[in-house]
């Protein structure tokens, strides 16, 4: 028997209701959004009422709504979390993205749970454990390569694997970063990351010699895996996740539309894959991720350690490379290159000291740029466009609603007429009305077809309409309009009542974890989490860093390696011309020692 096509999900971020709607209208199959509390982005919380409105719209198209509760929970918050989860379940949320395993022992409804990347999901053993615990969709660690993803899929074929494809990168393995808590009392595991990794540092050796001065040595480029989607599909990824719950609407529209196009191109060639939702989206611009915020792009270890992934010069957006400065005059700059700027664009460059400088372009005349204020730029400097005025206008105007394609048939009955509608998701409605059947004096078929096709400001658009009788009856336009409106309401009601959510199975008996002890990186912050792990056979459980900070332990665990970025990778035979240990020093004098575990290809950051 032929296998059914694999349903593939494009998962887009949303900081609020409006952004979520924009994501859906630009091609998302699912959206993830923050709850009022307990999400990994404190600045991106939303009311339950807004989430309820979102689910009603999303479910029309089979789009799923995931809510992020991906932080660790304290004991005095458990009752609030239980109450919030019940509210979210009651308004139709499809799943929660969670970090704290204590949630599995809470008194909550059977809402589906997904394992956040904050759980540090990078081994088949970990994924299998979570899957057996009832978390059917697992967000993989960003650092995993194609071969590792393939191996996990083969080992745990039932688990739905979710992987990031685009957006900002955390330098530490997610869930294992304690730098923000240590330095600023703001826990990344509590949704309050202070972005320690985007700071500027000096790199000094054991003798105090400055190796690198004032660089963003932990700041990474942004992920862009758009060229590798097919390989990821074949490795077993079924959910493609865009990072960015703090990003503005234009970013989400642009990146979502771009990945929608790329995936649809693959589906057209590969019928074994299909999108998981329904509806036509028509962005009113040509998507281009290079035109939205980015620090430069990397596929981030997807095919091993090759290209450098760091963005040492700046943690800010570079945008798209446009050309090289050919000449600097008193009040304008001449640029060589095939790309063109426009009035109102933002431009930037890296100066001789390695710092990012920017300026606004007031006027463009051919290859001449007239800045609002002349920057200190020299001949030969590469220019980037980090704000495209024209593109941003196009994206902001793009508001075309999503539509379900609809096939209609209009038939004659014994005592009237019937209108049947079936949309692309398979939802069907039929209405019969009694009506006098008088023959028309003039041909009516063209007018009837036009009346039947007028679905206007509804979620439907007619792509096929058939009038299945030969007689030319006079049918009042008001009757056709009433039938059309009634059938529309019937379709909408069926979408509301027939939508089926996946529900979580009860926690199984006899679930065991191979580890017998867990250190602070397990992030156990409440009694329920401790009880969960104890029930799985764990005997020694350390408290979370946020509760009892252990001394002299790594604050970060990174696959990014500063020695590799600087050309001193010992695994490739290179020698470092400075004495170890190396340390990072921030502007206020605080120091952080670097530990290099070359066998595991990992760099650790430890406070001195």
Region spans (language model):
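Surface-exposed amphipathic alpha-helical tracts and adjacent flexible/coil segments at the periphery
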Residues: 1-25, 30-40, 50, 54-55, ...
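An active-site metal/cofactor-coordinating segment within enzyme catalytic domains
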Residues: 43-47
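Short, conserved active-site loop motifs that form the nucleotide-linked donor/cofactor pocket
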Residues: 94
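Short active-site loop/helix that positions an aromatic residue
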Residues: 104-109
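Ser/Thr-centric signal marking residues that sit
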Residues: 116-117, 121
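Short, glycine/polar-rich helix-capping loops at beta-to-alpha or helix-loop-helix junctions
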Residues: 122-126
């Amino acid at each position: 028997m032929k296998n059914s096509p694999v349903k593939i999900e494009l998962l887009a971020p949303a900081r609020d209701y409006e952004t979520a709607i924009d994501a859906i209208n630009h091609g998302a199959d699912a959206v993830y959004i923050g709850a009022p509390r307990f999400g990994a982005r404190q600045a991106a919380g939303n009311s339950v009422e807004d989430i309820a409105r979102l689910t009603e719209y999303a479910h029309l198209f089979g789009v799923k709504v995931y809510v992020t509760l991906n932080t660790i929970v304290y004991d005095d918050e458990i009752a609030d979390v239980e109450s919030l989860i019940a509210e979210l379940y009651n308004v139709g949320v499809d799943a929660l993205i969670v970090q704290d395993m204590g949630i599995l022992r809470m008194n909550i409804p059977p809402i589906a749970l997904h394992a956040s990347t904050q759980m540090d999901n990078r081994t088949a053993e970990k994924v299998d454990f979570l899957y057996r615990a009832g978390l059917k969709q697992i967000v993989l660690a960003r650092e995993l390569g194609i071969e590792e993803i393939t191996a996990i899929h083969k080992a745990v074929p039932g688990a739905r694997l979710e992987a990031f494809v685009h957006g900002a990168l955390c330098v530490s393995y997610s869930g294992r970063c304690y730098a923000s808590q240590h330095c600023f009392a703001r826990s990344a595991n509590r949704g309050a990351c202070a972005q320690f990794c985007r700071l500027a540092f000096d790199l000094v050796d054991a003798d105090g010699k400055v190796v690198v001065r004032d660089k963003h040595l932990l700041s990474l480029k942004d992920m862009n895996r758009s060229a590798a989607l097919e390989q990821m599909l074949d490795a077993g990824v079924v959910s493609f996740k865009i990072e960015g719950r703090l990003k503005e609407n234009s970013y989400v529209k642009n990146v979502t539309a771009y990945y929608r196009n790329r995936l649809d191109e693959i589906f057209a060639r590969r019928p074994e894959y299909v999108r998981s939702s329904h509806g036509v989206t028509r962005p009113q611009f040509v998507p281009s991720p290079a035109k939205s915020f980015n620090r430069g792009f990397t596929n981030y270890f997807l095919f091993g350690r090759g290209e450098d992934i760091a963005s040492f010069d700046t943690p800010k957006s570079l945008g798209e490379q446009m050309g090289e400065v050919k000449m600097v005059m008193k009040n304008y700059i001449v640029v060589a290159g095939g790309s063109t700027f426009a009035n109102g664009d933002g431009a930037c460059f890296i100066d001789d000291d390695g710092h990012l400088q920017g300026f606004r372009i007031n006027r463009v005349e051919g290859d001449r740029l007239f800045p609002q204020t002349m920057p200190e730029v020299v001949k030969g400097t590469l220019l980037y466009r980090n704000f495209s005025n024209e593109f941003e206008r196009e994206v902001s105007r793009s508001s075309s609603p999503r539509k379900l394609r609809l096939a209609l048939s209009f038939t004659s009955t014994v005592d009237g007429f019937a209108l049947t509608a079936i949309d692309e998701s398979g939802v069907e409605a039929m209405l019969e009305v009694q009506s006098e059947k008088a023959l028309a004096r003039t041909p009516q078929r063209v007018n009837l077809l036009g009346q039947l096709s007028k679905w206007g400001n509804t979620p439907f658009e007619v792509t096929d309409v058939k009038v299945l009788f030969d007689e030319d009856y006079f049918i009042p336009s008001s009757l056709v309009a009433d039938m059309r409106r009634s059938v529309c309401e019937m379709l909408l009601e069926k979408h509301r009542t027939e939508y089926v959510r996946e529900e979580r199975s009860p926690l199984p008996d006899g679930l065991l974890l191979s580890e017998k002890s867990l250190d602070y990186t397990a992030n156990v912050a409440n009694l329920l989490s401790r009880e969960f792990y104890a029930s799985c056979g764990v005997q020694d459980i350390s408290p979370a860093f946020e509760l009892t900070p252990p001394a002299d332990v790594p604050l970060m665990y990174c696959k990014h390696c500063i020695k590799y970025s600087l050309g001193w990778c010992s695994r490739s035979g290179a020698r470092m011309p400075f004495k170890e240990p190396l340390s990072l020093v921030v502007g206020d004098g605080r120091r952080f020692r670097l530990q290099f575990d070359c066998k595991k290809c990992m760099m650790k950051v430890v406070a001195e």
